[in-house]
Amino acid sequence: ALALAEREIPCPRVMALYRIPCAKREAVRYRPLPGKTLRELIRAGEEAPALRAQLGRFVAGLHEAGIYFRSLHLGNIVLTPDGALGLIDIADLRASGKPIPRHRRLRNLKHLMRDEQDRAWICHPDATVFDRAYNIALGQGAADRA
């Protein structure tokens, strides 16, 4: 959460972190991020191309900022009341000081498109809205960087 806050990406505020030694895991207690997930919005009939473009720019921004979120999907992306996109359920998020490499970007985008209804919303009716916004946010040729 700190890495996201440093990059001004809306996210839940961590209240406590608990280590569970026997399971070799951690649990997080946090204050929820206000808003609705994109999955909630699209299942309620949201069809705004501007939101698709905003999503493309948001994901590109995450990748350029060194944010690798293994659980990236529309159920973990929130549209906040002020119109910004943010992330929830961020326990498996990793942050580095440099843009994530191409192979991880591709894996992340594949995961984003895993749910059939999510994929249908992102790609329909104009499949280029998300792609165009993603690539423009990265700049000419940036998507092919290693």
Predicted regions and their residues:
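A short, local hydrophobic-aromatic micro-motif
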Residues: 12-15, 75, 110
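Conserved hydrophobic "DFG−1" position in protein kinase catalytic cores
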Residues: 32, 79-80
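Short alpha-helical scaffold element within the canonical Hanks-type protein kinase domain
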Residues: 48-52
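Hydrophobic residue at the +6 position relative to the catalytic HRD Asp in the kinase catalytic loop
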Residues: 72-79
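Active-site beta-strand-loop-beta-strand hairpin of nuclease catalytic cores
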Residues: 81-85
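C-lobe/activation-segment region of protein kinase-like
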Residues: 86-146
